[in-house]
């Protein structure tokens, strides 16, 4: 099986010569061209569709409003800045979210950059909070996060955005009319990471995950084009919770090193686990029971998310199905390793990730061919 665990190279984005600030990925920009070992679902023409362009939703064409398209156009950021911002978000996704990034490769070209943008927003905020290599105090990180958030909401109100990440996020939010309240909730939860190191109960943890995970699902919905957005909200939120709880279980050791425990303290007490037990190289029987309990809880969230897949546009379903398998497979791997969470990060094998991708590729290509893209020209394009 071709190794697809690390997504094939996408080396940049370039403006389209015909439709304003379109996105294109070199190596994928000629008709019929694909990257090694990875066919592009339904790809037939040059370049990626520009931000603000959508394909038809279930049953009929659907595009962002003209007002949204105008707001998201060149007035928000120049073409060079915009394409560079989308490329930066793609790089963040590829570098830090390999399973998620692999699943996004099953989306149609025109949807993918917007998903990268939303991932980039979340990842960049996370890097501010975790202070990766900057040596800032918690107070300085709080100020940096507040400043970044204020600039983001300011850009949404108008003006030219030159931020290397936010230009793409602002463009995506305007193009699809994504609820700004979701971003406020997310930033509130990110700020909690600067002061809160543990959660007493699962309800307390859910209060944090509401902003850090559930709203990520609802942010994505407009891009994924559900037939019934209202019905799709609950499953989308459940999927966000499932993904994050999976990460919390897998990353127990990494979080401990940062002084955080995301597993509810009430659960530790229930199974007779002390925080220090989570740092033992060899998990105790009590730790194994605790982690098995948390895995079962995560699986319940995955089950609650499943009905939402069929509500999405057909071209979005293969991506989400693959993501469900990729993240759910981490729980399988944790169980197979007898909950050895401190001996390196638990990952699916390259062969298994490749097999999951290949299993959904045909459906992705078929759906992309059926959904004819509708071009929304931006003013001045």
Please state what every model-predicted region is:
Residues 2-15, 68-243, 249, 253-381:
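Catalytic cores of Mg2+-dependent Asp-rich isoprenoid enzymes
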């Amino acid at each position: 099986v071709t190794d697809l665990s690390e997504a094939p190279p996408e080396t940049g984005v370039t403006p389209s010569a015909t439709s304003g600030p379109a996105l294109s990925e070199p190596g994928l920009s000629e008709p019929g061209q694909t990257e090694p070992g990875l066919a592009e679902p339904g790809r037939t023409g040059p370049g990626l569709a520009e931000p603000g362009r959508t394909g038809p939703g279930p049953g009929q064409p659907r595009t962002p409003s003209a007002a949204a398209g105008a707001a998201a156009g060149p007035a928000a950021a120049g073409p060079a800045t915009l394409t560079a911002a989308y490329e930066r978000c793609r790089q963040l996704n590829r570098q830090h979210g390999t399973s998620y990034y692999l699943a996004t490769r099953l989306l149609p070209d025109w949807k993918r950059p917007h998903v990268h943008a939303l991932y980039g927003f979340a990842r960049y905020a996370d890097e501010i909070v975790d202070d990766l290599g900057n040596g800032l105090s918690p107070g300085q990180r709080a100020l940096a996060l507040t400043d970044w958030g204020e600039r983001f909401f300011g850009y949404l109100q108008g003006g030219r955005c030159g931020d290397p990440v936010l230009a793409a996020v602002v463009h995506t939010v305007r193009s699809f009319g994504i609820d700004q309240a979701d971003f406020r909730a997310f930033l509130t939860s990110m700020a909690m990471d600067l002061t809160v190191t543990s959660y007493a109960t699962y309800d307390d943890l859910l209060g944090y995950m509401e902003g850090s995970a559930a709203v990520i699902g609802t942010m994505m919905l407009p891009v994924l084009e559900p037939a019934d957005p209202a019905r799709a909200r609950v499953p989308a939120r459940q999927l966000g919770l499932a993904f994050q709880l999976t990460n919390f279980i897998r990353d127990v050791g990494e979080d401990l090193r940062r002084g955080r425990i995301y597993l509810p303290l009430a659960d530790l007490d229930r199974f007779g686990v002390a925080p220090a037990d989570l740092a033992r190289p060899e998990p105790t029987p009590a730790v194994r029971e605790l982690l098995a309990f948390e895995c079962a809880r995560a699986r319940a969230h995955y089950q609650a998310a499943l009905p939402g897949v069929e509500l999405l546009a057909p071209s979005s379903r293969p991506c989400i199905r693959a993501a469900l398998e990729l993240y759910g497979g981490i729980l399988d791997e944790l169980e197979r390793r007898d909950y050895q969470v401190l001996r390196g990060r638990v990952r699916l094998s390259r062969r298994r990730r490749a097999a999951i991708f290949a299993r959904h590729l045909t459906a992705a290509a078929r759906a992309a061919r059926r959904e004819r893209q509708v071009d929304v020209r931006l003013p001045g394009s």
